[in-house]
UniProtKB/Swiss-Prot annotation:
GO terms for molecular function: 3-isopropylmalate dehydratase activity; 4 iron, 4 sulfur cluster binding; metal ion binding. The gene is leuC2. Catalyzes the isomerization between 2-isopropylmalate and 3-isopropylmalate, via the formation of 2-isopropylmaleate. Belongs to the aconitase/IPM isomerase family. LeuC type 2 subfamily. Its EC number is 4.2.1.33. It comes from the Archaea. Keywords: 4Fe-4S, Amino-acid biosynthesis, Branched-chain amino acid biosynthesis, Iron, Iron-sulfur, Leucine biosynthesis, Lyase, Metal-binding. [4Fe-4S] cluster binds at residues 262, 320, 323. Its cofactor is [4Fe-4S] cluster. This is 3-isopropylmalate dehydratase large subunit 2. Binds 1 [4Fe-4S] cluster per subunit. The keyword 4Fe-4S applies. It comes from Pyrococcus furiosus (strain ATCC 43587 / DSM 3638 / JCM 8422 / Vc1).
Length: 380
């Protein structure tokens, strides 16, 4: 039996109705949820939280009015609203909201981030989340699982981003529709574990989860990844699975570097970038987005923020930043970006005529110094 089968109490392929231990949404999805909820329900019967993280503080009157609507709804239904403290997925972890929880639903596709904590976490659309708010439960089809066993330890330049990019390349031609990824023997810290599960939806997986002991029982596919044989990787435009070794695109001129997001905006990741930038000056626009206010505070307390500022980087208030192309750091026509985020589709960070490459924070920081995509091996 897979880990997810144990949590949901059934076999893959079965449909089950289960109570949801936690449901959450953000300022980008909540207006549609409110519209759907008000058509059918009058009372919230779920444990719910709302986070303002996508476009905050409000940059336009239209968005300010939408956020006011969310606040009014939350006040009526006594739902906590957390504003400007960071990205929802990160805050759920920091606030300990998954304690004593097994099933979590978020109104965001990267909700599987929380699978790093060993919970079944999935993203759903506005209508489904509205129903969960009204009923406190929903139906699930139990997904099949791919077991991924990590072996060895990575080199100093390889991070969790490289592991998940490698996995995306392995699963590129495999049908992951309604299948999950279960990771085992993971040697990373929590900061890096969250990157693994955050990124699995880019393989078209239903969710991801990290377990302790691999049994091999009930898995539709098994993969082993030798970490000590991995090198820094880059995803080329316009698909996160379009993965190549960094040396294949080395020398590509870039206009902007973004280090942050729900993928790589935690303290360990940003501090590694800061170590590289310390005492140097960036050659291109370099934007850093802490995943939470707690991360930002620690950056200040431990001197990480100072290193970044003195190197010429701009530190954003905690939130999604330019990742979704709506706020702070949007890119223009023909611009080339190296980003530590999880998506590089056309138009993701602004102009559909821009090109987005994805990498780990170490590669991004080194590239910011040279103004072009640079292999950290040999450069530092």
């Amino acid at each position: 039996m897979t880990l997810i089968e144990e949590i949901l109490g059934g076999k893959s392929g079965e449909s089950v109705v289960r109570r949801v231990d936690l449901v959450y949404a953000h300022d980008g999805t909540m207006p549609l949820i409110i519209e759907a909820f008000n058509k059918v329900f009058a009372t919230v019967r779920a444990r719910a939280y709302i986070f303002f993280d996508h476009v905050y503080p409000a940059p336009t009157v239209k968005i300010a009015n939408l956020q006011k609507e969310i606040r009014d709804f939350a006040k009526r239904h006594r739902i906590p609203v957390i504003e400007g403290q960071g990205i929802s997925h990160q805050l759920v972890v920091e606030m300990g909201l998954t304690e004593n929880s097994k099933i979590v639903v978020g109104a965001d596709s990267h909700t599987p981030t929380l699978g790093a904590l060993g919970v079944f976490a999935v993203g759903m659309g506005a209508t489904d989340v509205a129903v969960i708010l009204g009923l406190g439960k929903t139906w699930f089809r139990i997904p099949e699982s791919v077991g991924v066993i990590l072996e060895g330890n990575p080199s100093r330049y390889v991070m969790a981003t490289d592991v998940i990019l490698h996995l995306l390349s392995l699963l590129k031609d495999y049908d992951m529709n309604y299948r999950a990824v279960e990771f085992f023997n993971v040697p990373f810290s929590l900061d890096e574990r969250l990157t693994l599960t955050n990124f699995v939806v880019e393989a078209n997986a239903k969710t991801g989860i990290i377990g302790e002991e691999y049994t091999g029982d009930g898995y539709v596919k098994e993969l082993e990844i030798e970490l000590n044989s991995l090198n820094p990787l880059v995803a080329k435009p316009h698909n996160p699975a379009n993965v190549v070794p960094v040396e294949e695109v080395e020398g590509t001129k870039i206009d902007q570097v973004f280090i942050g997001s729900c993928t790589n905006g935690r303290f360990e990741q940003i501090s590694k970038a800061a170590e590289i930038l310390e005492g140097e000056k960036v050659a291109v626009r370099t934007i850093v987005g802490p995943a939470s206010m707690n991360v930002y505070k620690r950056m200040i307390e431990e001197g990480v923020a100072r290193k970044l500022i003195e190197a010429g980087a701009v530190i954003l208030p905690p939130g999604c930043g330019p990742c979704l192309g709506r706020h702070m750091g949007v890119v223009g026509d023909g611009e080339i970006v190296l980003s530590t985020t999880n998506r590089n589709f056309r138009g993701r960070m602004g102009s559909p005529n821009a090109q987005i490459y994805l990498s780990n924070p170490i590669t991004a920081a080194v590239s910011a110094l040279y103004g072009e995509i640079t292999n950290p091996e040999g450069a530092i």
